[in-house]
């Protein structure tokens, strides 16, 4: 939890994750320029932030290494909903924690959150985001 690893740029693919400016991002597009007479190939990586939704891009040599976040995908149950936060209970450890609604909840499911339902949440670099609904209890 909160870990990261190093991966060579040439091994990255769209749909994977990368750290750009210490923000975990999902890779949307990678374009590789062919090497010149005296140089190495360069990769332009365009990615979207998981927590803030901002588009970021970097250019790196394909032989360089970049940081990749290790994302823990877990299941939790919504215990309470306040105007600013959602209180979640982890279904494995039964730990309780608060997730801010502004940055910690996926936009598509904000209206569907109810107490008692299970959700999938991602934890990386000490931050948590509720990504999708797992099912509803009656």
UniProtKB/Swiss-Prot annotation:
GO terms (BP aspect): positive regulation of translational elongation; positive regulation of translational termination
Which keywords does this chain's UniProt record carry? Cytoplasm, Hypusine, Initiation factor, Protein biosynthesis
Any GO MF annotation of the entry: RNA binding
What's one GO-annotated cellular component? cytoplasm
As stated in the Swiss-Prot or TrEMBL entry, residues carrying the post-translational modification Hypusine are 37
Keyword Magnesium in annotation: no
Q: What's the protein name? A: Translation initiation factor 5A
State the species of origin. Thermococcus sibiricus (strain DSM 12597 / MM 739)
């Amino acid at each position: 939890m909160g870990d990261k690893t190093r991966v060579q740029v040439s091994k990255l693919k769209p749909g994977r994750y990368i750290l750009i400016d210490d923000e975990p991002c999902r890779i949307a597009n990678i374009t590789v320029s062919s090497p010149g007479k005296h140089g190495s190939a360069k990769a332009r990586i365009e990615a979207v932030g998981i927590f803030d939704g901002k588009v970021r891009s970097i250019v790196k040599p394909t032989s360089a290494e970049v940081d990749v976040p290790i994302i823990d995908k877990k299941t939790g149950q919504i215990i309470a909903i306040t105007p600013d936060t959602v209180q979640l209970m982890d279904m494995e450890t039964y730990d309780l924690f608060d997730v801010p609604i502004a940055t910690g909840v996926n936009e598509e499911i904000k209206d569907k959150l109810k107490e008692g339902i299970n959700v999938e949440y991602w934890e990386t670099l000490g931050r948590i985001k509720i990504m999708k609904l797992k099912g509803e209890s009656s």
